[in-house]
């Protein structure tokens, strides 16, 4: 049996002011081509299909169309990640399951939808335990004792995977391939140069970290999601892989080689995982240099998303404008002055507080403040004036 494991699509994710839907369409089409060319029997998506719990219509459509196209030739299983809405997954599940797409939004008992077997997979000799993202404090009704919820998050994750492990071993026997698909952080994995990077920092700290002991010994393969850097999970008793995101989602992921994982599995043997590169997606590049040196690389950098730090001897009021004119995919630009000198202070003068805030926002973000944010700021100022 051959499985394609992918994760962390984050459909709808933006990079600064730049929409990335065209890139996502390209890489998702690449995933479809790989699935067909490698004749895979099952596709697993280990969470964060969308970037927001309530995706915009074009994002929702792209995700659903991709899942349905993948399911035309084999079953598809997708669990909800921390960016996904469990309720959305559960609402869509009965509509999509007849088409071969199995969405699991919440953590369920093994005998109540938490484990998917051959009957739901068109006779495929596999049994798959599905572990969506678990939020801190979330009660799962098949825990042995309610008192266990006062234990640490890592213990809760391990208890749930232990229960799934038992169900997998019992149902797989000697004839089926047991698989676990999960969306959580294992401590000790490589997160990246900038910490949480494209992930929500709230869900990347110690409070949301499990240990490698949470990976049980029963599955022949564990398909992990949540970490965007593709990698093998260290210290586990069975093969476990973070497939990683399909695109470099922010500059902390610049230079990473994105992939899907092709898994060869058969009953009674540990699976073998193979990396298949994803070639689509625009480059993300960080550059620190003088403006003249950066401008000399215009041809090289013109098609890349850029984070520029420009070495300058003094104030250059036209830097942002020139940078945006030269580089259409510029995301950030900032001046670096000798000795780390701070930028000139903003002075109010005759300007309104809203005008001052608008300039501050423009300096910090290299783009105009959204109208709704300016309106909110104005309301706060008016409320402060009224109570002064």
Q: Which residues does each PLM region occupy?
A:
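Metal-dependent catalytic neighborhoods of phosphoester/phosphodiester hydrolases
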Residues: 14-16, 49-67, 80-100, 104-105, ...
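Conserved catalytic scaffold of divalent metal-dependent phosphoesterases
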Residues: 91-94, 98-204, 266
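Binuclear metal-dependent phosphoesterase catalytic core
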Residues: 112-127, 131, 238-305
């Amino acid at each position: 049996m051959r499985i394609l494991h992918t994760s962390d699509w984050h459909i709808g994710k933006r990079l600064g002011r730049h929409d990335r839907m065209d890139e996502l369409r390209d890489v998702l089409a690449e995933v479809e081509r790989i699935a067909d060319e490698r004749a895979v029997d099952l596709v697993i998506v280990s969470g964060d299909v969308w970037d927001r719990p309530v995706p915009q219509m074009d994002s929702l459509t792209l995700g659903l169309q991709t899942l349905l196209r993948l399911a035309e030739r084999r079953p598809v299983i997708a669990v909800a990640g921390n960016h996904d809405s469990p309720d959305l997954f559960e609402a869509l599940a009965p509509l999509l399951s007849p088409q071969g797409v199995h969405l699991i939004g919440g953590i369920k008992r093994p005998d109540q939808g938490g484990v998917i077997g051959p009957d739901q997979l068109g006779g495929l000799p596999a049994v798959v335990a599905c572990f969506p993202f678990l939020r801190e404090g979330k009660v799962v009704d098949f825990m042995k004792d309610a008192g266990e919820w006062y234990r640490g998050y890592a213990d809760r994750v391990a208890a749930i995977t232990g229960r799934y492990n038992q169900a997998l071993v019992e149902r797989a026997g000697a004839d089926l391939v047991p698989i676990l698909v999960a969306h959580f952080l294992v401590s000790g994995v490589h997160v990246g140069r900038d910490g949480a990077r494209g992930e929500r920092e709230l869900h990347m700290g110690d409070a949301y970290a499990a240990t490698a002991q949470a990976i049980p010994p029963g599955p022949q393969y564990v398909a992990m999601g949540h970490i965007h850097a593709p990698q093998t999970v260290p210290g586990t008793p069975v093969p476990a892989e973070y497939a990683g995101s399909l695109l470099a989602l922010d500059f902390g992921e610049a230079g990473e080689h994105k992939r899907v994982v092709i898994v060869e599995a058969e009953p009674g043997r540990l699976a073998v995982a193979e990396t298949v590169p994803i070639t689509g997606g625009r480059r993300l590049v960080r550059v620190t240099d003088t403006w003249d040196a950066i401008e000399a690389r215009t041809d090289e950098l013109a098609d890349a998303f850029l984070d520029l730090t420009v070495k300058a001897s003094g104030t250059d009021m036209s830097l942002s404008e020139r940078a945006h004119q030269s580089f259409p995919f510029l995301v950030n630009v900032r001046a670096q002055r000798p000795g780390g000198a701070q930028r000139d202070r903003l002075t109010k003068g005759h300007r309104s507080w809203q005008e001052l805030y608008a300039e501050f926002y423009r300096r910090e973000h290299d783009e105009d403040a959204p109208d709704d944010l300016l309106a909110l700021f104005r309301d706060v100022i008016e409320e402060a004036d009224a109570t002064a």
